[in-house]
């Protein structure tokens, strides 16, 4: 039998007939084939064999609407090749008797978007300090969003319109110059693992005098008779370490190897709690190390709500003229003014009840100063930072400060106090950190008020507590000062005072002093290791900077004359201003 040819089979098929379903006359429009379609269909290709399929894509592209398959013309209508049902089922429906709940939606005004946070420059005389000007704007893609640490590996939770919030970028407290060399970068997670148990220390010498604390401030104020905060002219000094004449004398006597002041050391010991940028100058001369602060540093200013989630905004970012008194720099100047005057007002200035230290104030010159001295005692204390492996002991001398005395009602002994003040600017304003209204809640819900302050001002309270422990003070007095008018920073009232023991307050705040001493010892060891092979007589200078946008410390090696020109220029400006005032 001859083989069958496929060509013969195809040729034998009827020419007038076509393969596939029979053509319906309903799909003909004036003799032209017509396919029903929907106006909502997208125009596309009949078939595209070159584009990648949805199954070939991975990751987020498989679900991205920009990468969906092109729809074929008429795909939104009924299937042309579907089986027609014998009966019309278009009128058939199923009744759903399940109970549905209304979905709650938020309107346009349901949320507020806050953009950025920064600092603005401002200086002050006497413990001069300031914030650097920072502009607002979006950061780079690899920048942290207002990073507080702790959630870097697990992401972060997003809130209402969080996508529309720009990253909060800040500038460093001091600009890094081209001739600086970065030696090391340490993140806070590594610093938190350090620990060094250090004894309480011993007193080396004491200077100044103290007045007794006025106990009437501990009582709840009578309604309608609030005490106004007074502005008192008293001379108080906050000299940097290397310019302290007492420390210079102790260094010549080899009383210690490392020298610092309590305000500088407390910032270093509480560094993992900081958010804003700060810097410390470290000078290594011979075998002595000095922790200094530069001219115009921000260490002396008291920040407000630095650790709050919704911290105060700069004027350029908040774009509200009436909020100019609630910017970070303005609030810092206001808080510094409040702390200075509150410590002076809460003591009873009486020459009969004045207690002198062993030596007079080392910074006061009666021939030049016209203002009387403030109640202040400077205690120089020595701490042992030695380890078992050290061949020679490593001692550190710290200048600490005490503000007032208090009689112990039991044994009648004098107790040394540190007096500080927390300030409230406006509980309803942006940047308040969801704080309670102090006027109505301070005495009825004091625990909640203090807990909120510990959260919003974690660094500030930790520094004050550390300074009290370094000074071996017997107690702390925390005042609560509020504005007389929330829209004005001119007048303030004292709402109350709460007393704490430094160690108890440190335990409540989960403040680990051993971790702080571990940070100090690590920095000292690093400086000594860098200069091990250098000439001992050569002066080496370093700058330790807190990164403004990340929880990181950076150590830079700088020329020995760094910041000296700035100090000379500042001194010349002061002389010119003094001459103009005299004229």
UniProtKB/Swiss-Prot annotation:
GO cellular component, one term: cytosol
Compartmental location: Cytoplasm
Any GO BP annotation: cap-dependent translational initiation
UniProt-recorded Gene Ontology molecular function terms: mRNA cap binding; translation initiation factor activity
Top-level taxon in the UniProt lineage: Eukaryota
RNA gate, as annotated region: 298-312
Alphabetical keyword list: Cytoplasm, Initiation factor, Protein biosynthesis, RNA-binding
Main localization category: cytoplasm
Subunit structure comment from the entry: Component of the eukaryotic translation initiation factor 3 (eIF-3) complex.
UniProt similarity note: Belongs to the eIF-3 subunit D family.
PANTHER family: EUKARYOTIC TRANSLATION INITIATION FACTOR 3 SUBUNIT 7, EUKARYOTIC TRANSLATION INITIATION FACTOR 3 SUBUNIT D
Name of the protein described by the UniProt record: Eukaryotic translation initiation factor 3 subunit D
Taxonomic lineage from the root: Eukaryota, Fungi, Dikarya, Ascomycota, Pezizomycotina
């Amino acid at each position: 039998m001859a083989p069958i040819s496929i060509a013969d089979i195809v040729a034998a098929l009827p020419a007038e007939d076509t393969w596939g379903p029979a053509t319906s006359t309903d799909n003909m429009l004036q003799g032209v084939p017509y396919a029903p379609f929907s106006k909502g269909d997208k125009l596309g290709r009949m078939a595209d064999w070159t584009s990648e399929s949805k199954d070939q894509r991975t990751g987020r592209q498989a679900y991205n609407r920009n990468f969906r398959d092109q729809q074929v013309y008429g795909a939104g209508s009924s299937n042309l090749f579907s089986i027609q049902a014998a009966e019309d089922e278009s009128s058939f429906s199923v009744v759903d008797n399940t109970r549905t709940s209304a979905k709650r939606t938020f309107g346009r005004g349901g949320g507020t978007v806050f953009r950025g946070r920064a600092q603005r420059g401002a200086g002050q005389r006497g413990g001069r300090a300031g914030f650097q000007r920072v502009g607002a704007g979006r950061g780079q893609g690899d920048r942290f969003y207002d990073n507080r640490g702790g959630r870097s590996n697990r992401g972060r939770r997003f809130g209402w319109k969080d996508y529309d919030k720009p990253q909060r970028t800040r500038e460093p407290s001091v600009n890094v110059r081209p001739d600086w060399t970065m030696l090391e970068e340490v993140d806070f997670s590594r610093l938190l693992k350090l620990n060094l148990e250090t004894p309480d220390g011993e007193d080396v010498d004491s200077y100044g005098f103290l007045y007794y604390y006025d106990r009437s401030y501990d009582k709840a104020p009578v309604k309608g008779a609030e005490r106004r905060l007074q502005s008192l002219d008293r001379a108080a000094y906050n000299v940097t370490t290397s310019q302290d004449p007492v420390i210079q004398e102790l260094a010549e006597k080899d009383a210690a190897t490392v020298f610092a002041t309590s305000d500088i050391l407390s910032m270093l010991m509480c560094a993992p709690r900081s958010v804003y940028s700060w810097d410390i100058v470290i000078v290594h001369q011979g075998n002595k190390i000095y922790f200094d602060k530069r001219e115009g540093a921000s260490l002396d200013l008291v920040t407000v709500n630095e650790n709050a989630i919704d911290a105060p905004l700069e004027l350029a970012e908040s774009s509200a003229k009436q909020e100019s008194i609630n910017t970070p720099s303005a609030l810092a100047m206001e808080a510094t003014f409040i702390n200075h005057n509150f410590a002076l007002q809460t003591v009873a200035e009486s020459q009969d009840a004045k207690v002198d230290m062993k030596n007079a104030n080392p910074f006061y010159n009666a021939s030049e100063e016209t203002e009387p001295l403030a109640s202040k005692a400077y205690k120089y204390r020595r701490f042992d930072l030695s380890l078992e492996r050290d061949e020679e002991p490593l001692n550190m001398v710290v200048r600490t400060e005490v503000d007032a005395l208090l009689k112990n009602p039991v044994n009648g002994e004098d107790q040394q106090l540190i007096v500080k003040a927390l300030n409230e600017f406006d509980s309803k304003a942006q940047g308040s950190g969801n704080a309670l209204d102090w006027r109505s809640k301070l005495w009825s819900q004091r625990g909640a008020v203090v807990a909120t302050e510990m959260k919003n001002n974690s660094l500030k309270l930790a520094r004050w507590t550390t300074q009290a422990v370094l000074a071996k003070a017997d107690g702390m007095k925390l005042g609560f000062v509020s504005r007389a008018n929330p829209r004005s920073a001119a007048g303030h009232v004292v709402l109350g005072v709460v007393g704490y023991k430094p160690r108890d307050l440190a335990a409540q705040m989960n403040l680990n002093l051993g971790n702080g001493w571990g940070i100090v010892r690590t920095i000292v060891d690093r400086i000594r290791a860098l200069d091990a092979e250098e000439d001992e007589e050569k002066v080496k200078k370093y700058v330790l900077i807190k990164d403004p946008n990340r929880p990181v410390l950076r150590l830079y090696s700088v020329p020995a004359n760094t910041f000296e020109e700035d100090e000379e220029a500042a001194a010349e400006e002061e002389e010119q201003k003094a001459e103009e005032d005299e004229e």
